[in-house]
């Protein structure tokens, strides 16, 4: 009985990816959507371990609503019909970028907007109202999405 259980455990563990403890993710996916808009808007910038796994809620972070020019840019490119979207994206995905790269909330939002603006020529590849429009390495250089 113990051999069967051990065998099942080995099978399960074989399917789990081991991530370098210094890197909780390997690249980023830029997701867009047409939720509440006729045009594609930012959904989020998501740290990824591989094409099917991503870290989330890596660190307990507080959310401070953007102000000034950042708020203007976010309303233009990251339109949030649901007022909790920005907070959700920061706490779920941005917290992992803060954990690994020590970036703050404003840097997370500004980086996401910059990558979106650099990727608008790729929007025509989207075949649905939500898609991954581009992938970036850890230095924010465009890479092929896997």
Report residues per predicted region.
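Cleavable N-terminal signal peptides of Sec/SRP-targeted secreted and luminal proteins
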Residues: 3-21
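Short linear motifs in intrinsically disordered/low-complexity regions
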Residues: 1-3, 21, 27, 130, ...
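Intrinsic disorder/low-structure terminal segments
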Residues: 1, 5-8, 107-108, 135
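C-terminal, well-folded lobe of enzymatic/effector domains
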Residues: 68-146
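Betabetaalpha-Me/HNH-type nuclease active-site subdomain
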Residues: 17-80
